[in-house]
Amino acid sequence: MSAICQVTGRKPEFGKQVSHSHRRTSRRWNPNVQRRRYYLPSEGRTITLTVSTKGMKIIDRDGIESVVAKIRARGEKI
């Protein structure tokens, strides 16, 4: 599963882990993404989205219909 949110576009970020002795090694911070199913009443079917927890709050605030319209306007297939 890809660690990219379909609503916000959040991706993993990269940086350095710094130990107590200040030795630096590469690491990545993954966003908290979940696979969630949402029901689209206009189409009468459910869709599965990979969304971050912030994306879930956006869906709760704006509604699934408007969020799906924005995703489709970007050219992403759902």
Swiss-Prot record:
Keywords: Ribonucleoprotein, Ribosomal protein. PANTHER family: 39S RIBOSOMAL PROTEIN L28, MITOCHONDRIAL, LARGE RIBOSOMAL SUBUNIT PROTEIN BL28M. Pfam families: Ribosomal_L28. Belongs to the bacterial ribosomal protein bL28 family. One of its GO terms (molecular function) is structural constituent of ribosome. It comes from Corynebacterium aurimucosum (strain ATCC 700975 / DSM 44827 / CIP 107346 / CN-1). This is Large ribosomal subunit protein bL28. GO terms for cellular component: ribonucleoprotein complex; ribosome. One of its GO terms (biological process) is translation. InterPro entries: Ribosomal_bL28, Ribosomal_bL28/bL31-like_sf, Ribosomal_bL28_bact-type, Ribosomal_bL28_sf. HAMAP family: Ribosomal_bL28 (MF_00373). It comes from the Bacteria.
